[in-house]
């Protein structure tokens, strides 16, 4: 395996695209830190799948839109693996509603999870990666950033960057 000894963090790794990315990275030799916000059971299932295939993974709960959680996540990665080689910013939520009916707290939740989290995790990862002068950061987006969907103004505005 070409990436033995390298570590990747995947946010939102307990299901969907994040799960698929985590499995792919593990199959290529990365030790994978599986971040999840709510479903420990789903994250543990991904960890088990990776380990059953001979890979290395650990789960770490945290809301990546909260700086204290991000600090804890990165301290844990440094302790467990010594550093980080790849960050995949995949965590995301939606709170669909027509703009004129959207509650401000739903707007704010999407902005925090889908945008602020990228700032916080990228800042922490870049600090680790700059020390070793190597690393990769991948931000997952959506076609909704190009075409938009009814009821997803908050989600779509984050993706066209």
Task: Please place each PLM-identified region on the residue numbering.
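Residue(s) in the substrate-gating loop at a strand-loop-helix junction
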Residues: 142
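Conserved small/polar residues in nucleotide/adenosyl-binding loops
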Residues: 160-161
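Substrate-binding pocket helix/loop in short-chain dehydrogenase/reductase
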Residues: 98-99, 106-111
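A short, exposed helix-loop element centered on a Lys and neighboring polar residues
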Residues: 122-123
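Conserved glycine-rich Rossmann-like NAD(P)H-binding loop of the short-chain dehydrogenase/reductase
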Residues: 28-45
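The beta1-alpha1 cofactor-binding region of Rossmann-like NAD(H)/NADP(H)-dependent oxidoreductases
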Residues: 40, 61-73, 104
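Conserved glycine-rich cofactor-binding loop
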Residues: 7, 14-16
């Amino acid at each position: 395996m070409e990436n033995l000894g390298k570590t990747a963090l995947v946010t939102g790794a307990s299901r969907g695209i994040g799960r698929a990315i985590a499995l792919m990275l593990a199959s290529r030799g990365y030790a994978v830190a599986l971040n999840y916000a709510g479903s420990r059971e789903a994250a543990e299932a991904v960890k088990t799948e990776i380990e059953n295939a001979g890979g290395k993974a650990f789960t770490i709960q945290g809301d990546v839109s909260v700086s204290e959680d991000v600090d804890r996540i990165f301290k844990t990665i440094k302790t467990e693996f010594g550093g980080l080689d790849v960050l995949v910013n995949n965590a995301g939520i939606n709170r669909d509603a027509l703009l004129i009916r959207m509650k401000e707290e739903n707007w704010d939740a999407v902005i925090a999870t889908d945008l602020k989290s990228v700032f916080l995790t990228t800042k922490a990862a870049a600090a680790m990666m700059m020390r070793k002068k190597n690393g990769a950061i991948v931000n997952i987006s959506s076609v909704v950033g190009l075409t938009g969907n009814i009821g997803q103004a908050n989600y779509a505005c984050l993706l066209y960057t």
